[in-house]
Regions:
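Residue-level detector of alpha-helix initiation sites
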Residues: 56-57, 80, 162-164, 203-204, ...
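FAD-site-proximal beta/loop scaffold in flavoenzymes
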Residues: 163, 168, 174-190, 288-335, ...
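Beta1-alpha1 glycine-rich phosphate/pyrophosphate-binding loop at the start
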Residues: 44-117, 206-232, 239, 305, ...
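A Rossmann-like FAD-binding core segment of flavoenzymes
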Residues: 46, 114-145, 150-153, 213-314, ...
Length: 361
């Protein structure tokens, strides 16, 4: 993969002008970010006070604060710039947008703001890193991109996010944003008075089902076994709730949608005990089989918990390695919201600034 650098629209003399990108964004006209490739043979070494890894709300916010602190940050965008919000349609719970905003549009505006204040945004994927024993007054942290580029940084913010686990069934990817979701907190509002299904049997599924009762008229929990894995107290709440029913020993073979544009209208189920098939009419489906943090490249470099989430100090973003900070869903196994991710991105940048200031004295 060639390295790619994100550019703002080009001014008449050929110079990149991030201010024009932001001005256009603020006017409500969100431009595409032009991506140009660099030949594989032209690898580079980038040196910075702060390297931000990840281009979601946490990463962009960290970059904005770092740039305003004159840390001249470099942001490595990763495989999916914009993160999970790039597959989210209406975002109605992010402050500042009275009528809501499209997920991709929100991320375009964040990218524009980060570029405007001086962040260098590079489209690359970190594939190797050396964090232990580096940073601070010693050798800089060394990271390598898929492009072959080397990144040397005095401090690092890891904001690579997490991904919802999916079933991989027909209709699931196709109808995301049209009735298929993995976040009840994000999308439950759209199903007021409707019937929705939740797929899963652990804490995540039960919590999603309970949350959805605040909006939906009927919530159907679908589980492939005859008992739940969720904590007993959550199960008690689930079974006692009049809006919730459970379909046991069932798997979803297909998510069905109709209309133009298509919206989810039902699920094709299969009873794994009897082998019988059933069509279940629903207005939406929430896949709740857990999340997986994007931390594979940092394994054995920073401390992680049993699910792979990066461990940070209570109430902060410091990791087990001084000078390395973590923000957003990569260290948040509870909230997983755009606004909380942005908040921890701010915290990480402020903590990195203080860390670097301490190194200079």
């Amino acid at each position: 993969m060639a390295r790619r650098i994100w550019h703002a629209p080009v001014a008449e003399k050929g110079a990149a002008d991030p201010a024009r990108l932001v001005s256009s964004a603020l006017d409500g006209h969100i431009p595409c970010i032009v991506i140009t490739s660099t030949p594989e043979s032209m690898t580079q070494t980038h040196t910075t006070d702060l390297l931000v890894i990840g281009a979601g709300p946490a990463g962009y916010t960290a970059a904005i604060y770092a740039a305003r602190a004159n840390l001249k940050p470099i942001l490595v965008a990763g495989l999916q710039p914009g993160g999970q919000l790039m597959i989210t349609t209406d975002v109605e719970n992010y402050p500042g947008f009275a009528r809501g905003i499209q997920g991709p549009e929100l991320m375009e505006q964040m990218a524009a703001q980060a570029a405007h204040v001086g962040t260098q945004i590079i489209h690359d994927i970190i594939t190797e890193c050396t964090l232990k024993g580096h940073g601070g007054a010693g050798e800089p942290f060394r990271l390598v991109g898929d492009s072959g580029d080397v990144y040397l940084a005095r401090s690092v913010v890891i904001a690579t996010g997490a991904q919802a686990k999916w079933l991989g069934i027909p209709g699931e990817a196709q109808y995301q944003g049209s009735g298929v979701s993995a976040c009840a907190t994000c999308d439950g509002f759209f199903y007021r008075g409707r019937t929705v299904a939740v797929i899963g049997g652990g804490n995540t599924a039960v919590e999603e089902a309970l949350y959805l009762t605040h909006h939906a008229e009927h919530v159907i929990l679908i589980h492939r076994r005859d008992s739940l894995r969720a904590e007993k107290i959550l199960q008690d709440r689930l079974f006692a709730h009049p809006k919730i029913t459970v379909k046991w020993n069932c798997v979803v073979d297909e998510i069905v949608a109709t209309g133009t544009p298509p919206v989810v209208t039902g699920l094709n189920l299969r009873d794994i005990s009897s082998g019988t098939n059933e069509h279940l009419a629903v207005d939406g489906v929430f896949v709740a089989i857990g999340h997986a943090p994007n931390t594979a490249v940092f394994k054995d470099q920073v401390e992680t918990d049993d699910e792979g989430y990066i461990v940070t100090n209570p109430g902060g973003t410091r990791t087990s390695v001084p000078g390395v900070f973590a923000a957003g869903d990569v260290q948040d196994r509870i909230y997983r919201q755009a606004v909380t991710a942005a908040g921890t991105g701010c915290m990480a940048a402020l903590e990195a600034e203080r860390y670097l200031a301490g190194m200079s004295h």
